[in-house]
């Protein structure tokens, strides 16, 4: 397959995600309507040339090289499709803050896969892109909803194949995500977790996951309250999030149905009914302020369409 013409341009829009949703450690995640935007352009240059220009919402510009996740994902597409690498520029508008537990790394991986694939007229099917995304990320709960949208449960079957289930999310259940002005890396958050957990904790999580999924499907308040409970990772990670437990308590007192660490943190997800959204948001921001942490708590919707791309060559 020949390289695309110089100047060909693809825009990819990728949603943020909230993963480890309640008891769904490393298997359950949902896409949210906060996006990173990537523009891929075929440029002149040698096959090892990859220009990455990132613009954050605060106007800062950064550059990245071949070690960047976008480039690594693009390489996976070229290898899988037996395509000779070519010079590529990726210009990124960042709205999803990094190291906040909102799947910023997943957006880079998914965008690199989709962009590199689309600019070659999509030789790889979406199923293959999902497989590559999970392989690069190491776990599925961010990249799968980021690519597909909605609430996704992903598990490895007895045949070692990944099985993905799109789960229902009732319209009455809304999300507030409190995003602090502090960072927490996934690697740091994983280091505090034990290698083994009691069987009773695993059983508790399995039961809670069943309750939560049924509650989200039906909009049943009580099932959500009882299901938003975790014993596998949150007990070990709360200590890494300054003021986190106080923020959780404030959200629940303001009427949230449940609260959880978003991804590896430090952002905190609250589930609530629509009429409680403003109160929950204000309570979470105030609680973090009392701990000396600046934050914002936007009211985000579950995004159901996943990542999108289109050809904008000549524009």
Curated annotation (Swiss-Prot):
Belongs to the GHMP kinase family. Homoserine kinase subfamily. Disulfide bonds: none annotated. It is found in: Cytoplasm. This is Homoserine kinase. It comes from the Bacteria. Pfam families: GHMP_kinases_C (PF08544), GHMP_kinases_N (PF00288). The keyword ATP-binding applies. The keyword DNA damage does not apply. It catalyses: L-homoserine + ATP = O-phospho-L-homoserine + ADP + H(+). GO terms for cellular component: cytoplasm. Its EC number is 2.7.1.39. Pathway: Amino-acid biosynthesis; L-threonine biosynthesis; L-threonine from L-aspartate: step 4/5. ATP binds at residues 97-107. It is an enzyme of class 2 (transferase). InterPro entries: GHMP_kinase_C_dom (IPR013750), GHMP_kinase_C_sf (IPR036554), GHMP_kinase_N_dom (IPR006204), GHMP_knse_ATP-bd_CS (IPR006203), Homoserine_kinase (IPR000870), Ribosomal_Su5_D2-typ_SF (IPR020568), Ribsml_uS5_D2-typ_fold_subgr (IPR014721). GO terms for biological process: threonine biosynthetic process. Keywords: Amino-acid biosynthesis, ATP-binding, Cytoplasm, Kinase, Nucleotide-binding, Threonine biosynthesis, Transferase. Its main location: cytoplasm. Catalyzes the ATP-dependent phosphorylation of L-homoserine to L-homoserine phosphate. Gene3D superfamilies: 3.30.230.10, GHMP kinase, C-terminal domain. The gene is thrB.
């Amino acid at each position: 397959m020949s390289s695309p013409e110089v100047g060909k341009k693809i825009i990819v829009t990728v949603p943020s995600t909230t993963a480890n949703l309640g008891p769904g450690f490393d298997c359950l995640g949902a896409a949210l309507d906060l996006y990173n935007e990537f523009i891929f352009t075929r440029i002149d240059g040698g096959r090892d040339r990859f220009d990455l220009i990132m613009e954050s919402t605060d106007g800062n510009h950064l550059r990245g090289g071949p070690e960047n996740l976008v480039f690594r994902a693009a390489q996976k597409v070229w290898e899988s499709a037996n395509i000779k690498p070519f010079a590529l520029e990726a210009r990124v508008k960042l709205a999803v803050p990094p190291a906040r537990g909102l799947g910023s790394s997943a957006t880079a991986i998914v965008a690199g896969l989709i962009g590199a694939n689309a600019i070659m007229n999509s030789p790889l099917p979406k199923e293959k892109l999902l497989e590559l995304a999970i392989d690069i990320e190491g776990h599925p709960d961010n990249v799968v909803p980021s690519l597909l949208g909605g609430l996704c449960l992903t598990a490895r079957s007895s045949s070692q194949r990944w099985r993905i289930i799109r789960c229902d999310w009732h319209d009455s259940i809304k999300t507030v995500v409190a995003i602090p002005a502090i960072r927490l890396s996934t690697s740091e958050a994983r280091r505090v977790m034990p290698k083994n957990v009691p069987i009773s904790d695993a059983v508790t999580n399995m039961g809670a996951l069943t309750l939560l999924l049924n509650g989200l499907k039906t909009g049943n308040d009580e099932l959500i309250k009882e299901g938003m409970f975790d014993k596998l990772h949150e007990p070990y990670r709360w200590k890494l999030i300054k003021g986190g437990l106080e923020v959780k308590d404030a959200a629940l007192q303001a009427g949230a149905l449940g609260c959880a660490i978003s991804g590896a943190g430090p952002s905190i997800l609250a589930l609530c009914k629509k009429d409680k959204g403003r109160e929950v948001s204000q309570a979470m921001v105030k609680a973090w302020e009392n701990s000396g942490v600046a934050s914002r708590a936007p009211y985000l919707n579950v995004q159901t369409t996943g990542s999108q791309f289109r050809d904008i060559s000549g524009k």
